[in-house]
Amino acid sequence: MELIRTEIPYCEPSHEALSSFSESTDAIVPDAFPDMGRIICAAGAATVKDELPQTDRILVSGMVNAVVLYQPEGESGVRKLSVPLSFAHIEEARGVTAESVCFVRCRVGGVTAKAVNSRKVSVTAQLCVETDVYERRTVELTEQIDPQADALEILSGQETIPLLEDAAVREFTLLDDLEIPGGERLEIVTASCELGLAGCQAMNGRAALKGDARLTLLALDDTGAFQVLHQTIPYTQIVECEDVQEGRTLAARLAVRHLDCMFAEGGVLSVGVGVGVLLLREGRHTLQTIRDLYHVHRTLELEERQLALRGCHLCGPFTGESTAVMPVSRPASEIISADAVCAGLQQSDDRTIRVSAQLSVLYRDADGVICSASRQLPVNVPIPASEASACVQDAALQVSATPGGEGNLNLRLTVSGQLTERPVLTLRDITALSVGAPRKPCGGVDTTLILRYIHAPEPLWEIAKQYASTVQAIRRANALAEHTESVSDAMLLIPVYNR
């Protein structure tokens, strides 16, 4: 008997993690700047330079462009101090090699600044890194057996699973100039960007991406007042995607790798967004499986294993809302800006995800003094029952804050992300097969036909296997329809062939 084995090439998600870490540095106030009096707030944006897969780990490195706003000693104005801060993070991931496909999303969860003295400041940036790793694999599976005789009975089946055919990382840059009324009077404090994807279409050897980049800028005008600006940049980009054919199912995930914003002459806002793209070529594979087998005359000696295939399917966008209360040291009278970053994500049950939200709020107190507050809060977000089997990736938070009572801020958070299903299909894989000793006679040495009453529903396959018969023989002997799979409350004639 010959095993007919089939090779199945596919791409498997092997590691996913959302982790947080911090990096610190000290900075000296430049000679041209006045002494620090009171630190108002600190913020920053991350630039990812490298995401290198190595043996059993991924090295993520880059730079945080941190900004410290302070009130000079003896003055009422606001000064901005830029502090570059490099970072390197090692994500442990067993099984990763240099050939692994890695996709990284890195965000600044928050920046804190503490004055060492009037000319020196210590800055700490909290970073949140989402890491996903995909491995290209090939497995062998016995889908058929050449019996080389009529005495081998095989019960075959089919299983369909969404397997990734390939994963690849690409990059592109969005460039645009935006007319901002009064922009010549503004100085950017910090900027952030959320990427939206409206469509991903497979072309021959390429992928067409369409969506928008949503910018949020915190700026100071020439009077020292804060302004929050929101701008949207639509985009259509073509990126290389080898071996993909037009019409195939293609999905994409996006990450901001760097963001550059500056006001040019005439108040024009020049924007450059570096975008990382994870392209996932999806496919639905139909596999023929061997559910059971037996030999009519002899026992079978076989070796088998349980083969687990992990699929991946991007189901679509997810949006959920929740509320929270954030305590602050000085009661707020006016909110200037509020920002939130996902620092952790856990599906607590079938209907709820638990989000660790890193919150930063800039506000004025009752005396008009500008204050800042940052805190990490757990937030429970409901999941619709229809989406309970999927996990949430690429989580982005939007937050609005209003002054509350008893020194609190009332927060409303919107969580958006990508729903992903990762089903695991376990298959029976026969790796070796041979015939053994003759089967024991059923009902006696000379028995060729057994009459049995079947009470409860019982599959014909199990009856045939037990009595060394075949399903087709039982159907013919009892004039059963070709599609009959089981019988109940019936007298059954069972031909016996094990002699």
Regions found by a protein language model. Give the residues of each.
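Primarily a LysM-type cell-wall glycan-binding module
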Residues: 437-476, 481-499
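Membrane-lipid interaction segments
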Residues: 1-444
